[in-house]
Structures are given as structure tokens and as C-alpha cells.
Amino acid sequence: MAKHVAEAPADGHQLVDRPFRSDIPGPIFDRIQDGVVRTVYRNLAFWKSPFDIAIYLQLLSRLRPRTVIEIGTKAGGSALWFADMMTAQGAESPAVISVDIRPCVTFTDPRIAFLKGDAKALAEVLTDQLMSQLVRPLLVVEDSSHMYTECMSVLSFFHPHLSSGDYIVVEDGIVSQLTDPAYLNYKDGPNRAVADFLARQGDDYEIDSALCDLYGHNVTYNPNGWLRRR
């Protein structure tokens, strides 16, 4: 099994000494979320928490990815941020590929390829030929619908394409702790997908607890979602 992975806690997820709940109480996350959905980067919506912006900077500095693949584009703010941060850290010819079923991007950037595609059918747009040509290290960011089926489809698609040392980050499992009833519609999709995926493929992955717990236990919007390929 993966490091930290094994039995079911009270919330029904399959994870041992790594409960998904964060040290930050739900009502405080609610207030943080109010700011997250108003956050912009270079005049584009950039819905990342302050914790995750800082955690991503640690990961980018350590991993030095040459390619970032983002599933879920929105207005392209995070894709642009990743491209800029890779450039700032001296990456040679940084590349970002951002896939969305309904892209609404109004700009172009030579470092970024915006592709139209379904998280449940990524092989149609991220072909074997394309994946084999990617320059490593690779960082994958799963930020699509936050529903279980899409999250699980993304994890399953990338599993055979990841090399040792590559990362895949499953975003927004924190929806399970936000108190607005609207978030119940996600049915804890990201966390359930991470738990089930690690139950099947756990020998091949490690939860990077140094990133998850940089500011306290799972003080991130991506609890137990920072996964490193062994």
C-alpha cells in the first residue's frame, strides 16, 4: 500500500494515519473561500488558496517541472500563473497544457496550449504520441469538476503516463469541509477518488505529507492530494 494508506476512518474513506480533515475548522475555510473566489492573477480568475499558492511554489522549486498539465481551465489564470512561475524559476522552454470541456479563455501565450476535452475521455485529446513527447519532470493538476467520476478518470488516465518523481495533485477535496450546502453536491468527490485510487495503486505513490502539512495537518485545499509517483 502507499505510504500513509490503509484503513477506513469515520468518514468512510480508505486512509490510515492520514485523515482527510484539515486542522482548519470549516467556518474558517468558508471565510477563506470567500477570498479565493475573488482572487485574480494578471486580471484573470485565479482560484487558488493562499496556502496552495505557497505550497505550489515549494513544489515548483523542488521538482523543476518542464511540463504542467492542468485538467480544468476556467479563464486560464492558473495556467498563466504556472507558466510564469516556471519561467521565473528558469525552466527551459516551459510548457503548460490546459484541458477543459468548455474553455472560456480569451488570450494566447506561446508557453500554453489550451485544449478542449472531457476529463472522462482524456485519451481523445492527450494522445499516446503527445504524452510520450512531453519533457519531464511532469506535474499534473486535476482541477476539473470535483466530482468522483471525473477525478477518478483523471487519476486512472495519468497513472500509466507518470514516471518516477512526477507529481499529480488532486485539487479541492476541501469541498467536504465547506459548510455551504451547495458543496454537498460534490459528494466529497476528490477525497473519495484519492482514497479509492490509492487503495488500488498505492504501491506506486506516496502522499507528500511535507507539502500537505506545510502549515499544519492538511492545511491545503487539496487534503492528501499531493501525490508523488514512486
Task: Map each language-model feature to its residues.
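A short alpha-helical cap/connector motif
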Residues: 1-230
